[in-house]
């Protein structure tokens, strides 16, 4: 949904006749409304002015922002281990292969 090019929306109103006269029914919502000024007594204004004269910043150690600790460096890649072949492999070759195995009688 996009916004319309208007800067404000107006009310859509319907009027209906009653025995008391005309009645206005609001069917839309306005995005802009006027704000009425607030009137305060002079004693209430003077009490709030005394409190607002010198605002202070809390200086206790518990409310201070902690110092930034630098992040550790990124982990490094491990080096690949190279498999070195030192020539052809030699296997055990007995003169008589049957002597290597043990025969069991069951």
Swiss-Prot record:
GO MF annotation terms: protein kinase inhibitor activity
UniProt entry keywords in alphabetical sequence: Cell cycle, Protein kinase inhibitor
GO biological processes: regulation of DNA endoreduplication
Keyword Membrane: no
InterPro entries for this protein: SMR
Function field: Probable cyclin-dependent protein kinase (CDK) inhibitor that functions as a repressor of mitosis in the endoreduplication cell cycle.
The name this protein goes by in its record: Cyclin-dependent protein kinase inhibitor SMR15
Underlying gene: SMR15
